[in-house]
Each structure stands twice: as structure tokens, then as C-alpha cells.
Regions:
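Amphipathic alpha-helical interaction surfaces in cytosolic regulatory modules
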Residues: 19-99
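General small-molecule cofactor/ligand-binding pocket signal
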Residues: 4-6, 80, 100-102
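Short beta-strand/loop segment at the start of cytosolic alpha/beta domains
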Residues: 1-15
Length: 102
């Protein structure tokens, strides 16, 4: 369980597993820092397929990620594996207006 960064030639994928809460803050930030260091021309995705719990601090981390990415010219961030409880929270919080939910 935790947060890790996957990289391909054209994008970075931050994978979150288990609970996405404040305990994941440092690991998420470290992965985000590394992903953004790769450059603004690359895509950025967050894979939430294995997330079973999502709290408000996770929503805040996603918004900070969006702001930092946008400042580097990354306009589109996809949230992958959004289903069930996780998708419901994201839609109720209107995150479907800020991110591509897949």
C-alpha cells in the first residue's frame, strides 16, 4: 500500500493504493515533484484503481497537483480507475470539471 511513480516515454503515472489520506501526503508530494521535474511537455495521470478510501486531504493534494502542473504547462491530468465510492466523491466535489475521469 502506498504511492509510487510509474514512468513511460510520454507520461508519468502516480499510482495510489489503499487509503488516500493525509498519511500519503509526503509520498504523493515526492512522486509529484519527480513527475514534474521530467518536464511540462509530458502527460500526467493519477491511477486510483486500487484506492479504497479517499478523504478531503487527498482532494486537496489533487488540487495542488493540478495547480503546480498547470504552472508548468500541463493542462490535462487524467484520474484513472475512478469507480464506485471514489468516483462518487470526485463527482460530488466537481473534480470532473478539473480532471479527466477515466
Amino acid at each position: 500500500m502506498g504511492v509510487r511513480l510509474g514512468k513511460t516515454a510520454d507520461k508519468s503515472v502516480i499510482v495510489v493504493e489503499g487509503r488516500f489520506d493525509f498519511q500519503q501526503h509526503e509520498a504523493f508530494r515526492a512522486c509529484l515533484d519527480e513527475a514534474l521535474e521530467r518536464g511540462g511537455g509530458l502527460g500526467l495521470e493519477v491511477d486510483l484503481s486500487w484506492v479504497d478510501y479517499l478523504e478531503s486531504s487527498a482532494l486537496g493534494m489533487l488540487l495542488v497537483m493540478r495547480d503546480r502542473a498547470k504552472a508548468l504547462g500541463i493542462d490535462s491530468i487524467a484520474l484513472l480507475g475512478c469507480r464506485g465510492f471514489v468516483r462518487q466523491i470526485l463527482v460530488v466535489a466537481s473534480f470532473d470539471k478539473f480532471f479527466t475521469l477515466r
